[in-house]
Structure formats: structure tokens, C-alpha cells
A protein has these predicted regions:
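Membrane transport/envelope proteins' first extracytoplasmic loop
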Residues: 2-261
Length: 261
């Protein structure tokens, strides 16, 4: 019985070899494609995790409607499990490029101690061209293909508020000279995000020395977690490590709110 089935099978293949070969080729291509996708996904995760570690991407981003004071930052730094802390400012404003109104996200970067061994230098910039800001009134632009050639080194960007407030309420200067083009791990894709300013979509991101911001309160705080860099960003152990510190920081925040009252 078994030999008969085998003979019939080979007879069918021989009688319609073209159809058999086509089906075989389709299956082989599908299996090869699936195997390649399966292998490449793990490689991509490994590469991105290494990139995040190299440029010290934040593990936690803290936001507060009331802002952060120096006392708040001290309390965050003293929370068990916290490794690096960078208190910064961020604001969405407007500018004009050509004849178009453009929404600009302005982010603060450390003015001093940008060394790679400084754990508080979080979301480190990778310079593509030019240099980093060294004085007030200078900025670097996040490089993207869309604005390549439209905003370049040597250009001056004039900023204005997107609401009834004056720009001086947010920034000490309204003009910034572009001195460099950079990549940042904070934005892994070309999409920067949404905004309540302008058209609703952020078109361009610039970084200035954090001291260029006006106001007494930090708008956001980036935190790295002790031991998290040794773990794979996409694994459960990483999320467990970060979540433990997240809970502690929540308790720290509650205490700081009570202290302000």
C-alpha cells in the first residue's frame, strides 16, 4: 500500500512537474522570507538597544503640571535606584521657513559637562555636522531629510510664541544661530510628535543650552535607572527593573507635593 502511494505521488509530480516546481518555489520563498524576518527582528532589537545605551537614552521621563524645583530634583536624585538625572525645559513655538509657518520644538541640553562618562548627560546628541551650542543664542537642529537644505548651519531662526504670551516668557532670546546638525536618540523616527501650537504637528526640533529658557521651574526630568543599561530594552527584566523605580519615584512625587503645600 505504502509503495503504491509513493509511486502514484512521483507519477503525479512527473506528469505535472511545472506546477509542482512552482508550488515548491513559492513555499521555499515563503519559508526563507519568514526565516529572514524572524532573524532580522532580533538583530534590529539588539542594534537599537546598543544605540540607546551608547547615547544614554532615558528610562523614565517625569512630567508635572506644577513644574520641578531644585528641591524636587534633589529628591528625585536621592530616590533608590536612580542613576542619572537631567532636569530640562521644553517648549513648542513658531517660526517661518520660506513662506511656511512651522512649529518648532525647543529642547534644553546641558551647557557644561557633556562628557560621555557623565551619567547626568541623558539623551546624548550625536553630531552630524558643525558643533554643539557653546553660548547663548546658538542652537543645533535635529537632522532630518525633510528639512535638509531648508535649515542649515549658519542660518538664524527667529522664534515667536504660538499664543497670546510673549516669547520672552518662555525663552530669553528669540533668535538662534544654527551651529550644528545632530541626531538624538530621543526621536528614533522622523516623526517628532503632535503639539497644541500651530498646525498641531511639530515640524522641526532644535536644541539650545538649557539656561536659555526663562522661568524658575523645569518642565520635565529625564531619569536613568541603575542596572537598566545592562538589560535588553525589549525584555521583561528591563521593564521590571524600571517599573520598581517608577513606583518609588511616584512616592517621591507625592512627598514633594505635600512639602510644597
Amino acid at each position: 500500500m505504502g509503495k503504491t502511494v509513493i509511486k502514484d505521488t512521483f507519477r503525479e509530480i512527473k506528469g505535472s512537474f511545472g506546477r509542482f516546481f512552482a508550488i515548491f518555489a513559492i513555499v521555499a520563498i515563503g519559508v526563507s522570507f519568514f526565516a529572514g524576518i524572524t532573524a532580522s527582528s532580533s538583530d534590529m532589537r539588539y542594534s537599537s538597544d546598543s544605540y540607546y545605551d551608547e547615547y544614554n537614552l532615558f528610562d523614565l521621563r517625569l512630567l508635572s503640571d506644577a513644574g520641578f524645583t531644585d528641591d524636587d530634583i534633589k529628591a528625585i536624585r536621592e530616590t533608590d535606584g536612580v542613576k542619572g538625572v537631567f532636569a530640562a525645559h521644553e517648549a513648542d513655538v513658531l517660526t517661518t521657513i520660506g513662506n511656511a509657518q512651522v512649529t518648532v520644538r525647543v529642547m534644553g541640553v546641558p551647557e557644561k559637562n557633556r562628557a560621555d562618562d557623565n551619567e547626568d548627560y541623558i539623551n546624548r546628541l550625536r553630531l552630524k555636522e558643525g558643533r554643539l551650542p557653546e553660548r547663548d543664542g546658538e542652537c543645533v537642529v535635529r537632522y532630518s531629510d525633510f528639512y535638509d537644505g531648508k535649515v542649515d548651519i549658519g542660518d538664524t531662526i527667529t522664534l515667536r510664541s504660538g499664543d497670546e504670551k510673549d516669547i520672552s516668557d518662555t525663552l530669553k532670546f528669540n533668535e538662534y544661530k544654527v551651529v550644528g546638525l545632530v541626531y538624538t536618540p530621543y526621536y528614533a523616527s522622523y516623526d517628532i510628535g503632535q503639539s497644541s501650537t500651530g498646525s498641531g504637528k511639530v515640524n522641526i526640533c532644535i536644541m539650545v543650552n538649557d539656561d536659555c529658557f526663562a522661568g524658575d521651574y523645569y518642565t520635565e526630568t529625564f531619569v536613568t535607572v541603575d542596572g537598566a543599561k545592562q538589560l535588553n530594552t525589549y525584555k521583561d527584566k528591563y521593564f521590571s527593573c524600571v517599573d520598581d523605580v517608577k513606583v518609588r519615584l511616584g512616592n517621591t512625587g507625592t512627598k514633594q507635593i505635600e512639602a510644597r503645600r
